[in-house]
From Swiss-Prot:
CDD domains: AdoMet_MTases. The gene is pcm. The lineage of its organism: Bacteria, Pseudomonadati, Pseudomonadota, Betaproteobacteria, Burkholderiales. Its EC number is 2.1.1.77. It catalyses: [protein]-L-isoaspartate + S-adenosyl-L-methionine = [protein]-L-isoaspartate alpha-methyl ester + S-adenosyl-L-homocysteine. The keyword Lipoprotein does not apply. Residues 33-51, 76-91 have a biased composition (Low complexity). Its main location: cytoplasm. One of its GO terms (biological process) is protein repair. PROSITE patterns: PCMT. InterPro entries: PCMT (IPR000682), SAM-dependent_MTases_sf (IPR029063). The active site is at 170. Catalyzes the methyl esterification of L-isoaspartyl residues in peptides and proteins that result from spontaneous decomposition of normal L-aspartyl and L-asparaginyl residues. It plays a role in the repair and/or degradation of damaged proteins. It is found in: Cytoplasm. This is Protein-L-isoaspartate O-methyltransferase.
Length: 322
C-alpha cells in the first residue's frame, strides 16, 4: 500500500471485519421481554376488578343463564340506587294492571250469577209477589245489562236507578208488582207498555206475554233499548218511537197496558185501546205530590173500574216526542 493510501486507510482490510453477532443474544432478549409481559399480566390479574368490571350473571328470558363476561370498554355509568328501585315498581304497576281485569271479571261473574238474581227473587216473593211466571221472568232477565256499568253493582238491589234523560229504571219490586197486577193469573196475548226506557220491563213482559208492544218518546232511550235487547234475542218485542199518550191504535186491543210514568189521569186513548176484560196498571198523581199505583179494568165497552193500590213515585207522563 502506498504511503498516501496508508494515510487514508490506516487500518488494514482484515481489521475492518467484525465478528458476527451470536444468535444466543437475540433469543435471550426475546425471552426476557416475554417474561416481563407475563409478569405484567399476572400483576394485572391480581388487581381487583375495578379496571375490568364484571357484569353479573342474569337470567335469560326462557330460564337459561347468561354467563358473566367483562364489560365493554365503552359503558354507561351505573344507575343510581334510586333508579334501580324504580324499575321493579314499574313492573309491579304493570302487574297490577294485568290483574285488574281478573278482579273485575270475578266481580262480574258473581254479579251475573243466577244466585244473585235468585236472592232478588226471594225478596220479591217475601214481599208478596206470588205469580210463578213473574218470578221466573224476573229471575231470567239480567237487569245489570240494562244499567250503566258504573251502576251494575246495584242492579239487583230494590232501587230505581238513573238511565239518563231524567228517566229511571223502576225498582224490581215495582216492576214485578205491576206485571203481576196486569196479568192477574191470565194468559196474556198482547201487552202494551208506555215508556220503554232502557228496555228492562219490556224484557220481563216478553216472558209473560205472547207479544209486547212498547213505546218510547225519547229518541236516545229508544235507541238504547234496542241495543240492550239485541243480545237477548227477544223475538216478541216490538219497539216504537212515538207519543205514549196516544198509544198504538193499529195494534189494539190489548189484554194489558202497563204505563211506566205518572200522569194526572189515565189518557182516554189508552182506555179505549184496552180490551174488554183487560187490565191497565199506571201511577196516577202529580210528580211533586202523592202518586198512587192504580188498576183500571174494562168491564164493558163503555165501563171501566178503578182501584187505587200502592203509593209510588214515577217520572211524569209527557206528550210529544224528543
Amino acid at each position: 500500500m502506498s504511503g498516501e493510501r496508508a494515510k487514508r486507510f490506516p487500518l488494514a482490510l482484515e481489521d475492518l471485519k467484525r465478528e458476527p453477532r451470536k444468535p444466543e443474544g437475540r433469543v435471550a432478549e426475546r425471552q426476557a421481554a416475554g417474561d416481563a409481559a407475563r409478569q405484567r399480566l399476572t400483576a394485572a390479574a391480581a388487581v381487583p376488578a375495578a379496571a375490568s368490571p364484571i357484569v353479573p350473571e342474569r337470567r335469560a328470558p326462557h330460564g337459561g343463564v347468561f354467563a358473566a363476561k367483562p364489560a365493554r370498554a365503552k359503558q354507561h355509568a351505573p344507575a343510581a340506587p334510586g333508579a334501580a328501585k324504580r324499575a321493579p315498581q314499574g313492573g309491579a304497576k304493570q302487574g297490577d294492571r294485568s290483574a285488574a281485569p281478573n278482579v273485575a271479571l270475578s266481580g262480574a261473574l258473581a254479579l251475573t250469577s243466577e244466585r244473585v238474581r235468585e236472592r232478588m227473587v226471594e225478596r220479591l216473593r217475601a214481599n208478596g209477589v206470588a205469580d210463578p211466571r213473574v218470578l221466573a221472568a224476573m229471575s231470567a232477565v239480567p237487569r245489570h245489562m240494562f244499567v250503566d256499568p258504573g251502576l251494575a253493582a246495584q242492579a239487583y238491589e230494590d232501587a230505581a236507578l238513573p238511565i239518563g234523560h231524567q228517566q229511571t229504571i223502576s225498582k224490581p219490586s215495582v216492576v214485578a208488582r205491576m206485571i203481576e197486577l196486569a196479568a192477574a193469573g191470565r194468559a196474556l196475548e198482547r201487552v202494551l207498555e208506555i215508556g220503554t226506557g232502557c228496555g228492562y220491563q219490556a224484557a220481563v213482559l216478553s216472558r209473560v206475554a205472547r207479544d209486547v208492544y212498547s213505546i218510547e218518546r225519547v229518541r236516545p232511550l229508544y235507541e238504547r233499548a234496542k241495543l240492550n235487547l239485541r243480545p237477548l234475542r227477544v223475538p216478541n218485542i216490538r219497539l216504537h218511537y212515538g207519543d205514549g199518550r196516544v198509544g198504538l191504535p193499529a195494534a189494539a186491543p190489548f189484554d194489558a197496558i202497563v204505563i211506566a210514568a205518572a200522569g194526572l189521569d189515565v189518557p182516554r186513548a189508552l182506555l179505549e185501546q184496552l180490551a174488554i176484560g183487560g187490565r191497565l196498571v199506571a201511577p196516577v198523581g202529580e210528580q211533586a205530590g202523592e202518586q198512587v199505583l192504580t188498576l183500571v179494568e174494562r168491564v164493558a165497552p163503555a165501563q171501566w173500574r178503578e182501584s187505587r193500590l200502592d203509593r209510588v213515585f214515577f217520572v211524569p207522563l209527557k206528550s210529544g216526542v224528543i
